[in-house]
Amino acid sequence: ESEAQYIHERLEALLKMLPAGTVIHQQNFYYTDRYHNTEYSTNALIAENNRHLNSKEILNNYTNLYVTFTNGQRNGKIRKNASGTSLMRKLHYPFKQPYKEYQERLTEMEAFLMNFENGLSSIQQFEIRKMDDTELNNAIYDYINLSYETPENDATQKSVNPMAINQNGTMKIGQQYVSILSLTNEGEHLQELAVPHTGKSKAYGGNIEMPDSIRSKCSMLYPVGLGLPFNHIVNIVIEITDADATVTAIGAEKDALNYITNFYPPAAEKQREQEAFCNEITQFDYQTAYTAFNVVLNDHDRTSLMRKTALVQQGFSFMNQSACYVENAELCNLFFCNIPGNARANYRGFINTTKQAICYLQKEGMYLSDEK
């Protein structure tokens, strides 16, 4: 627990070093596989473990972390909640022409990015490796093609599976149906670590042996991350915002509610919450952020996908009674919003602080052994 607190403090300090407009995108991939270990060991315990676990179904996980940046100008509005839809605003499409003079901005950001990379490397509990251009291209392909369970080595010779969307909002990539669930209401308390709530392992289907109860503390996203024994992706997007601009925007929204507080009591309650938030930012010098969190599901069978969607909804409720929204009309739009490098386009988010946003990151590498 002390190590988790240390990691949390280090990450908070690293994010404070980044300028406003920087976007941190953690993309976690989970997929099922079978355990195979052909290594011979003279250690009786290791040999027995390998024999017992061999050919059993397991859940694999790997994480990619992307850092993107903007031109640094404060000419955009501060986004405050998850209610906006990009279909009502100007189009956000990936890989459009970079803004003017981005080479100069890249030179400015180089020192920040180097410090961030060195800071992550210095955390003993982490092991990171910078992607080269080929690996980055492969990662983008694996996400768009939903082939993350078999990562591609050279995507330049590959074509993405055809995509189709019908009038009901159902989306298919190749032969796989896609579903996205976005976090819209945070739970009452955010914690660096929490003893996770878990459902019965039989409810998840499959042959992966999941623990019915866990006594050790895990990252807050465990119920929708390692706690779901089927293929899925979890995206966490943290955009560093300017604290002064954020407080000003929230203050303006608070003032706009003055006209309805007399006949609509919830407006007065919201004003009190907004004032308390702004006071906390000012008093403790917190770094503000715009945070988005979603889960991407894919399955060849639509009925199976619906069952998995229900299990993810349950997982959100286990995450401190958080609430999620099952995307329909915005499904395709949000899928493209989470392409590596395009995460700033994700509009299903909310304002909080980096101290709170870091709680959503997956910070552990977990190995759960069989009780036998």
Spell out what each predicted region is:
Residues 365-372:
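The Walker A/P-loop phosphate-binding site
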Residues 1-365:
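Extended, folded cores of ATP/NTP-driven motor/assembly subunits in large transport
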